[in-house]
From Swiss-Prot:
KW rRNA-binding (keyword) present: no
Official protein name in the record: 3-octaprenyl-4-hydroxybenzoate carboxy-lyase
Reactions mediated catalytically: a 4-hydroxy-3-(all-trans-polyprenyl)benzoate + H(+) = a 2-(all-trans-polyprenyl)phenol + CO2
Organism: Nitrosococcus oceani (strain ATCC 19707 / BCRC 17464 / JCM 30415 / NCIMB 11848 / C-107)
GO cellular component, one term: plasma membrane
Pfam families tied to this protein: UbiD, UbiD_C, UbiD_N
InterPro entries, per database record: UbiD, UbiD-like_C, UbiD-like_N, UbiD_bacteria, UbiD_Rift_dom
Cofactor: record remark: Binds 1 prenylated FMN per subunit.
Pathway in which the depicted protein is active: Cofactor biosynthesis; ubiquinone biosynthesis
Function, in words: Catalyzes the decarboxylation of 3-octaprenyl-4-hydroxy benzoate to 2-octaprenylphenol, an intermediate step in ubiquinone biosynthesis.
Gene expressing this chain: ubiD
C-alpha cells in the first residue's frame, strides 16, 4: 500500500485499528508524553489528539510506534519485507558489474525506475493553502510538546530540515530537533558533521555574514519522513528514494521566500534563515539516552513565513529511555541495514542493534569465520562502512551458531569464547555522540570490539572445546515418547 500524503496514511491506519483518536482534552505539556509512552510500551496504536489544550490543531503521536507501522510507511506489509528495501539500497550503493548482456538487461529496469523517480515540481501546493508572514508567525498557535519535567522549553521533534550548500546541486534533508525560543525563533540543533551543518559552514565561507536560507517541513508523507532517516546512498536523493518507496514521484514545491523545495503535501512549512553569529544555549532536554543532555550553543533559526494546509495536523514525538519511537524506528531499520552490510561483508549472517543500547551504541554481529583475525576485520568494517555506525561504541562479533538477538546466547558465548586481553580491541580518540556524557571529551571517545568467535590455530595454543549437543536420534525417540509421559 502506498500513501500520497500523511492524511492518506492516517486514514489507512485508522481503518486497520492502528490509529486511535483521543477526544478528551490533553495538555502538550508532559501529558501527551506520558500517554504516548504508555501506549508505545504496550505496542498500541498511533494517537491523534483532537483537543490539545490551548490550541485547535490536532497532534499526531506514536505514528511509527511499532516496527510494522514503520514497514507500512515504507510501503511494505511486514518488517521482514524491509530486507528487500535493504537489498535495493545495497545494489544502488555498489552495483555489481553485469557478467553479460542478460544481467545488464535485468539491471536496466532498476536504474530506469530510479531515474523515473526524480521529484516533480508543482506550483499549487497544499502546504501553501494558508500563508502567515512577519508578525503573523506565532509558534504558540502550534501545540508543540514539552516532553519531560526538566525540559527548558517546547521542542519541535519531527521537522524535516531542508538546506542547500552553495556548491551543491542537490538539497540536503535531515531531522534536527528545534527548541522554541519565541513566536518566530527556534534553535537548530545539528551536529557539526551532519549535512545541514556542513551546508551552513560552506555558506558562511562562500557568503560571509549573509543569512542562510532554510526550510522545515512538518507532517510530510511517511515515505519522505522515513527517507530522511534511512541510509540512502550519496548518489540518490532522499526524495527519489521516497518516490521508490511510494511508487510515484515525490511532489515538491518551491518556498515562497527562497529557492528551497519542500514536500508539497506537508502539513506545515517554516521558512526563514540562520544568521551567522546568532546562537543560543540549547537544552537541557530529556533525550533518547534516558538522560537530560548538556547545554550547548547552536544557531538560531528565524522564521519569516509559516505556511500550512487548511486544518493542519501537527506531527510530534518524544524521546526518552528506550523503548521510545526512535528505538522502534531502529528496530525496523535494522532489517534495512543487514543486506547493505552483507553486500560488503558476505560473511555476516546477522546484525542486531539492541533497542536498549540506544539503537546504535551497541551492535551484535554473527558471522561465518574463515581465518584468524577475521572477527577483527568485521568489527572494524562495521565502524567504518556506514556513517550510521560512527557512534557505535561496542561491537560484539560472534559465530553463526549464536543468536545475535538472544542475550542469553550472546552472554554464554562471551563468557566461554573470549579472553579479555586477547579478544578486546580498543580504539581511542574516535568520534562519539555529543549526547554521550560518558565520553571524557565532548564528541570524542573510545570504542571497543569483542571477538567472541571460536579461535583458530594462531589465535590460541589451547585445544578448543566442542559444544555439547544431544544425539538427534535420541531427541527424535524422546519426541515420540513425550505425550505418553504426562510431562
Amino acid at each position: 500500500m502506498k500513501y500520497k500524503d500523511l492524511r492518506d496514511f492516517i486514514a489507512k491506519l485508522e481503518a486497520e485499528g492502528e490509529l486511535k483518536r483521543i477526544t478528551v482534552e490533553v495538555d502538550p505539556y508532559l501529558e501527551m508524553t506520558e500517554i504516548c509512552d504508555r501506549v508505545l510500551h504496550a505496542g498500541g496504536p498511533a494517537l491523534l489528539f483532537e483537543r490539545p489544550k490551548g490550541a485547535s490543531m490536532p497532534v499526531l503521536g506514536n505514528l511509527f510506534g511499532t516496527p510494522r507501522r514503520v514497514a507500512q510507511g515504507m510501503g511494505e506489509d511486514s518488517v521482514a519485507a524491509l530486507r528487500e528495501v535493504g537489498k535495493l539500497l545495497a545494489f544502488l550503493k555498489e552495483p555489481d558489474p553485469p557478467r553479460g548482456m542478460k544481467e545488464a538487461w535485468r539491471a536496466l529496469p532498476i536504474f530506469k525506475k530510479v531515474l523515473d523517480m526524480a521529484p516533480k515540481i508543482v506550483r499549487s501546493a497544499p502546504c501553501q493553502e494558508v500563508i502567515l508572514e512577519g508578525s503573523q508567525v506565532d509558534l504558540s498557535q502550534i501545540p508543540i510538546q514539552t516532553c519531560w519535567p526538566g525540559d527548558i522549553a517546547p521542542l519541535i521533534t519531527w521537522g524535516l530540515v531542508v538546506t542547500k550548500g552553495p556548491y551543491k546541486e542537490r538539497q540536503n534533508m535531515g531531522i534536527y530537533r528545534q527548541q522554541v525560543l519565541g513566536p518566530n525563533r527556534v534553535i537548530m540543533r545539528w551536529l557539526a558533521h551532519r549535512g545541514g551543518a556542513l551546508d551552513f559552514q560552506a555558506w558562511q565561507q562562500a557568503h560571509p555574514g549573509k543569512p542562510f536560507p532554510i526550510a522545515v517541513a512538518l507532517g510530510a508523507d511517511p515515505a519522505t519522513i522515513l527517507g530522511a532517516v534511512t541510509p540512502v546512498p550519496d548518489t540518490l536523493s532522499e526524495y527519489a528514494f521516497a518516490g521508490l518507496l511510494r511508487g510515484s514521484k515525490t511532489e515538491l514545491t518551491r518556498c515562497l521566500g527562497s529557492g528551497l523545495q519542500v514536500p508539497a503535501s506537508a502539513e506545515i512549512v517554516l521558512e526563514g534563515y540562520l544568521k551567522p553569529g546568532d546562537e543560543a544555549n540549547e537544552g537541557p532536554f530529556g533525550d533518547h539516552t534516558g538522560y537530560y543532555n548538556e547545554v550547548e550553543k547552536f544557531p538560531v533559526f528565524t522564521i519569516e513565513r509559516l505556511t500550512h494546509r487548511r486544518h493542519p495536523i501537527y506531527h510530534s514525538t518524544y524521546t526518552g529511555r528506550p523503548p521510545d519511537e526512535p528505538a522502534v524506528l531502529g528496530v525496523a531499520l535494522n532489517e534495512v541495514f543487514i543486506p547493505i552490510l552483507q553486500k560488503q561483508f558476505p560473511e555476516i549472517v546477522d546484525f542486531y542493534l539492541p533497542p536498549e543500547g540506544c539503537s546504535y551504541r551497541l551492535a551484535v554481529v554473527t558471522m561465518r569465520k574463515q581465518y584468524p583475525g577475521h572477527a577483527k576485520r568485521v568489527m572494524l568494517g562495521v565502524w567504518s562502512f556506514l556513517r550510521q555506525f560512527m557512534y557505535t561504541k561496542f561491537v560484539i562479533v560472534t559465530d553463526e551458531d549464536i543468536n545475535a538477538r538472544d542475550w542469553k546466547d550472546v552472554i554464554w558465548a562471551m563468557t566461554t569464547r573470549m579472553d579479555p586481553a586477547r579478544d578486546c580491541v580498543i580504539i581511542e580518540n574516535t568520534p562519539i555522540d555529543y549526547l554521550d556524557f560518558a565520553s571524557p571529551v565532548s564528541g570524542l571517545g573510545s570504542k571497543i570490539g569483542f571477538d567472541v568467535t571460536h579461535k583458530w590455530k594462531g589465535e590460541t595454543q589451547r585445544e578448543w572445546g566442542q559444544p555439547i549437543t544431544m544425539d538427534n536420534a535420541v531427541k527424535k525417540r524422546v519426541d515420540e515418547m513425550w505425550d505418553g509421559m504426562g510431562l
